[in-house]
Amino acid sequence: MVSIKVSLADFIVKTDEGWIPSDNCPALDRFKTKTEKELLDSIKREGADRASIRKQLFLTPISNKRLTQIGGVPVRDIRTSTTIPSSTRNLITDWLLNIFNDEESGEEVENAIASKYPDIFCSADKISRVAQRLENRRDRVHEDGFRILSATMLAIDSDIATEGKCEIVRATEDAIIAKFEPVSEHLCIGNPRGVFYKAFPIKKEQPMVYGIKALLGISNRDFIMNHGHGHLRTVPYSEINNAIRSFAKKNEAEIKRIRSDSLSPNAGEKFINMCDMLLQKEKIETIIAKIMKNDKN
């Protein structure tokens, strides 16, 4: 099982009057606007850029026949069946509505989704950790929502200010290291992840010498991965299987880009070997077995 995803459409939908909360009512799926029908037809074609079409569907006002007493029903192709705790749903929905319905920046947000966001699907774990920040009324997440959303959706590289809830545990000359505790049960989407750490370089494109030594020491030499978003992340041994399977879903060009990224050598030989094995089309089970065998204490 790979990482769980949620969609922005699980929380909000667009209408002719603005953005409103999402609702789930399969009985109303039959009602679609002409534009929605055209986009849904195009998403089924061979070679279609499904992520781009999903973004268009998300930014298209829904049929007014799919309005309920709670909100609006997104088309099936842009929503997920992921179970989202009510606390997380309420926090994220209100946060997104404030961002998207803002008179000054709402249009900019929609333009960014169309041109810069890779998709409207994102990590459920990331969303859960944003919800943790939203519980704190003094957190900057309330004022800097657009930038934090962009980092959550992988449209920009994240940093300490735009990450989900975490604690800074170490700072070296070349890196800042943050600790990510398991998400609180009432906010957690899916199974909770173990403790992990991220190292953020002080200067981009510059190797982290002292930071990596600190990261290895703090994490008890956990497997380290570079996902190509400007930082390195540790992976607990029990989660390596899922982490590699999720990474393997990236296309070949993306894996090559990450393999040659300036941070990748800092992740260590095992990570480089994993990238090479994926590019050589080795069986995923073989890759996982080799990495996990080498990673045992």
From Swiss-Prot:
GO molecular function, one term: metal ion binding
Highest rank taxon of the organism: Viruses
GO cellular component terms, A-Z: host cell cytoplasm
GO biological process: viral genome replication
EC numbers: 3.6.4.-
Active-site residues, record numbering mapped to chain: H231 (for ntpase and rtpase activities)
Location of the region described as RNA-binding in the Swiss-Prot/TrEMBL record: 212-247
Keyword annotations: ATP-binding, Host cytoplasm, Hydrolase, Magnesium, Metal-binding, Nucleotide-binding, RNA-binding
EC top class, as a word: hydrolase
Co-factor(s): Mg(2+)
Protein localization: Host cytoplasm
Chief place of localization: host cell
InterPro entries associated with the record: Rotavirus_NSP2
Family under the similarity heading: Belongs to the rotavirus NSP2 family.
Quaternary context: Homooctamer. Interacts with VP1; this interaction is weak. Interacts with NSP5; this interaction leads to up-regulation of NSP5 phosphorylation and formation of viral factories.
The protein's name in its UniProt record: Non-structural protein 2
Organism placement in taxonomy: Viruses, Riboviria, Orthornavirae, Duplornaviricota, Resentoviricetes
